Amino acid sequence: MKPSNFNGIKKYFGRKKPSIQEIVREPTAGGIVFRRNKQGELEFLLYQDARERWTIPKGHIESGETAQAAAIREVGEESGLKDVESICWLGKVNFRYRRVDKLVLISQQNYLIRPRTSGDEIKKEEWMTDIRWFSMQDALDKVEYEDIGKLILLAMKRIRQEGF
């Protein structure tokens, strides 16, 4: 005897996704933002998105804008930090997702960024669940995207090399 919802389950899983009609390329930029707290300990800035995943400030590169300028702008817009500087390029992360009948290809350029002053307070955007500073280990424990974890480790290496 079939369960009463068998036909509904069969109908749901039997659906076919629409075929991909278009490939969309979206260049983006992000920042691994770091600082030294009052005790001199290194911290990294992460925010929690609507899906409750911790990640870094990032967003689309606008027309005529460099990836580095976009990373600095996005960090400011998403964190409230007004005076930041880009230290160096850390690398590119590529990922993709499907949006109905479109395949979206993201190419994200990432930069090591730090606040120039210690007085700026971070602010949470309404679409964020949370935003805060984490120790390196806590940041690595929080991020769910493996590539972002690798970027944090690379950032740590560069920070030590440069003596920040």
Predicted regions located by residue number:
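A small-molecule sensor/coupling module
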Residues: 151-158
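A short gly/proline-enriched turn/hairpin at secondary-structure junctions
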Residues: 55-59
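A short, flexible beta-alpha/helix-coil linker loop
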Residues: 51-54, 139
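Acidic, metal-coordinating catalytic segment for phosphate/diphosphate chemistry
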Residues: 2-37
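Short, solvent-exposed loop/turn segments that connect beta-strands within catalytic domains
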Residues: 37-43, 100-103
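Unchanged
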Residues: 61-150
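Short, acidic/hydrophobic/Gly-rich beta-strand patch recurrent on exposed beta strands
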Residues: 45-48
